[in-house]
Amino acid sequence: MVAPPPARQPLLAVDDLVVSFDGPLGTYRALNGVSFHVDAGETLAILGESGSGKSVTVRAVMALLPRHSARVERGTIRYAGEEISAKPVRRTRELSATEIAMVFQDSLTALNPVVRVGQQIAELFRVRQRLSRREAWQRAVAGLDRVGIPNAAKRAHDYPHQFSGGMRQRVVIAMALALRPKLLIADEPTTALDVTVQAQIMDLLRELREADGMAMILITHDLGVVADVADRVAVMYAGTVVESGPLREVYDAPAHPYTRGLMNSVPAPDRPGTRLTPIEGMPPSPLHPPTGCPFHPRCPVARANCRTDRPALRIVATGHEAACHYAQEVMTGVDTVKGAA
């Protein structure tokens, strides 16, 4: 009998990650058991509204949580099979300099305002690859040219404030990709950019990802952006992943009421004239989270057990998971439990 091939090892795997913060009003959990994985060469979109824990998740991966107010209570983070969450922060920072890179929301604060952009990129090559000043500068100019900065040799001498928002974000992308990372984390990379520039930046990220064969985690609340670039999607709500799976499966047959609510709350070209249905209520306060399923106070299909029993992620189809007691009903669109007490 021929043994089955070994399962492919994810490039990044996060399991049961719990992160707490100490604030002026008390201690609260920003992440409550987050689990997901990213395979080499794929794009995972982490989708959710503001405050769902998307950015905290990736900052935990990058070891960028504030030291004095945040702490990881439990969970593991593995990169290429190595458990980096158990290693000193220095090891994670080493990986973030060479293997994992991040594009932040605000390009202006991501760059040093008093250092020329070419010098900021060249410094990466000098420190990490021990290149000469001349060669490092040439690499920096080539990187700016690669991301579409016109007249890159001249613009490399400019300071961040001399670039428009869209061009400044291209500089940040050039810096992130300078050392050819295997994983790029893009945290709301088009925030504060106009619609046309947003599309240009997302097209650029997609082209560069395909050219370099790297994996990408895209943090966003925009369903349209996810549909354009992602292979898989993880939906977050109240500090946990409530659904994950292949993009088309999650979009075509969402298995969690929150995901279905997101789909029904935005216009869809294939449903002209369809009335939009907002999700009722507000996200829970992290200081006073609900018992049971975190979505039950807003859920149209909640039953009594949803108020007491927290559902775990379970498989509903190949590669498709949802944290809902009634995932099958939600997937088929049959509201058999709506209004049940």
Specify the residue positions occupied by each region the protein language model found:
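Conserved ABC transporter NBD signature motif
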Residues: 72-83
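A short, proline-enriched helix->beta-strand linker immediately N-terminal to the Walker B motif
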Residues: 178-182
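P-loop NTP-binding/switch modules centered on Walker-like glycine-rich loops
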Residues: 63, 185-189, 193-274
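A short, flexible loop at the N-terminus of ABC-type nucleotide-binding domains that lies
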Residues: 7-11, 20-33, 64-70, 87-92, ...
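Short catalytic/signature loops enriched in Gly
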Residues: 4-10, 150-154, 244-341
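Conserved ABC ATPase "signature" region
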Residues: 82-83, 135-154, 263-264
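The feature captures the beta-strand-to-loop junction immediately N-terminal to the Walker
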Residues: 47-49
